[in-house]
């Protein structure tokens, strides 16, 4: 067998997170388990083919919509409201090119940390929107996937591993092979900076 990034470092990290790949591809809320024991670090593995998204979409909107409904009673009362929140998040992502990465990250972080609200309450009162449940972590959906492709115009990039929480890609991992001395962690860091930060929101 030829050793490469996919079957050494990438597979090791994936298996550490999810306890190994199985035929089971359902990824509901809560930590992954097998026979009532935590699987790896509790992440569910889904192949990038099994994620309901197009390459030009940064978010896995079906998963995000389900999470918004599950975590927010005001959205559960009217599930169409989830689309209003997704629209706001999409606008931040699409604004990266004009507003800059730092400003977009700050705006998205405000949503992630529960600092944003929408007029979904009684008489149009603003209620805080939860994208992640920090109080009950079992309410969140944790997915690790490999070869997550994102296309921005003519540019297509593929990350080795991506960690998604509630349909949002929050961690990008660029694995480098331990068997090629010419590749190091610095190469991975430069690739993330040069390829992803400059070209992909």
Residue map of PLM features:
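An alpha-helical interface "stripe"
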Residues: 1-201
């Amino acid at each position: 067998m030829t050793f490469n990034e996919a079957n050494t470092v990438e597979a090791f990290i994936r298996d550490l997170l999810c306890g190994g790949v199985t035929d089971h591809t359902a990824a509901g809320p809560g930590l992954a388990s097998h026979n009532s024991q935590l699987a790896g670090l509790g992440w569910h593995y889904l192949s990038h083919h099994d994620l309901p998204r197009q390459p030009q979409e940064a978010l896995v909107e079906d998963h995000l919509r389900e999470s918004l409904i599950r975590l927010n009673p005001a959205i559960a009362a009217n599930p169409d409201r989830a689309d209003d929140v997704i629209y706001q998040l999409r606008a931040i992502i699409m604004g990266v090119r004009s507003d800059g990465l730092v400003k977009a990250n700050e705006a998205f972080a405000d949503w992630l940390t529960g600092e944003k609200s929408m007029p979904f309450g009684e008489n149009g009162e603003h209620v805080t929107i939860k994208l992640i449940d920090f109080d009950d972590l079992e309410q969140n959906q944790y997915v690790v996937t490999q070869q997550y492709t994102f296309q921005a115009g003519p540019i297509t990039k593929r990350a080795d591993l991506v960690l998604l929480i509630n349909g949002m890609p929050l961690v990008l991992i660029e694995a480098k092979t331990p068997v090629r001395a010419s590749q190091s962690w610095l190469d991975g860091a430069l690739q993330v900076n040069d390829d992803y930060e400059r070209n992909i929101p």
